[in-house]
Amino acid sequence: GLNFPNNAPGLYIAPFKNDLVVIMNTFKNMNEKIVVEDVPLNKWINVIIRVEDENVDVYINGSIVKRHVLDSVPKQNYDDVYMSMNGGFSGYSSNLWYYDYGLGTTAIQEIVDNGPDLKMIGEDFLGSKPRYFSLRWFFNNTDSNNQSYGGF
């Protein structure tokens, strides 16, 4: 389920689908939704959510896959930042960074180029699955306002 009341931003995996759902609180709309469809499973992916003024850009592995203009100014979340609430997901998180400014494309690419931190507490995690995914995925994400999620 959604965290309440603060989602500025909130990042969720859609139930029963491999879609990412970004939720932003604004002063006009409590939960503006941006859907990134058909995200590859069982692969490391880098997700960057950049908010500047009323514009939200979602990057996957350094490529912008969604651009969304909010209905109004986003609400700033002054509370704690939570990860993997309500049971989380069956996967791993590598790093979480929160900046007080919108990163430029060079900084975004540097983060992607550095890759995930594969060092787990007490052991190394080097998966045997390839770290790439089909370019076809990039061409199938065009609608940022998918309305098909009952709880989202």
Task: State the predicted function of each range.
Residues 1-152:
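Extracellular glycan-associated modules
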